[in-house]
Amino acid sequence: GRIDTGNLAYVHELSDIESLNQRALKAELEVTAVSIHAYAYLHERYAMLNSGSSMGDGYGPRIVSLAPRPDYPRAALKGLRVAIPGPLTTAALALQLYQPACETIVMPFDQIQEAAVAGEVDAGLLIHEGQLTYADDGLHLWEDLGAWWLEDTGYPLPLGGNVIRRDLGDEVITQVARDLRASIEYALEHRAPALAHASRFNRGIGEERTDRFVGMYVNQWTVDYGVRGRAAVQLLLDRAADVGVIPARIRVDFVG
């Protein structure tokens, strides 16, 4: 109720990203967050909104293990069982670009850290708060895929974005884009109450880590991709297509 949305009403649904990816594949949702990886399969029905990105600028999904970090983690991952948070997550895509020869085990994102600690898998690919808490459980960082991607390409790693169904039409798309941007700007300008709201969903990591984690992925990149951010999205999907992780190159349409 902080933003004037005119004649549009929004119903907020909270869900994990892989569930949203799967629902978007069925075009169930008019506006939703999705993984950039998933957008390769959604682009005909959905356009990418310019606001709402989660960008890993020198950081991102982390590969962790009970075993200490080897000298050459990329090579060491060959043949190992790695838990991933869903086949259409961008974390899974980045892992395939980093080391396609590992064996991936799909499980809910909030069970991966526990599985790695229990030795049920050789390594886990962590998204969300696990990126900050893995060492508390005695896990070792093998690779930060966002740091690797920046070193490899010079670009941030685009993890997620907001999309809107094309059949809503230009007028509604324009208004939704405006409302979304306004809501993000409002949250950044009123950080304390926004963090208090976010803390309700932080899975027990405490205020300091919540503040840090939110700052990692809700920032000026979230307000607008900008030229560099849009190029980063296109580059990631081009790379994925070129090595056969996604079926073909696509042109990403940004709106708003």
Model-assigned labels for residue ranges:
Residues 108-200:
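Pocket-lining segment of extracytoplasmic ligand-binding domains
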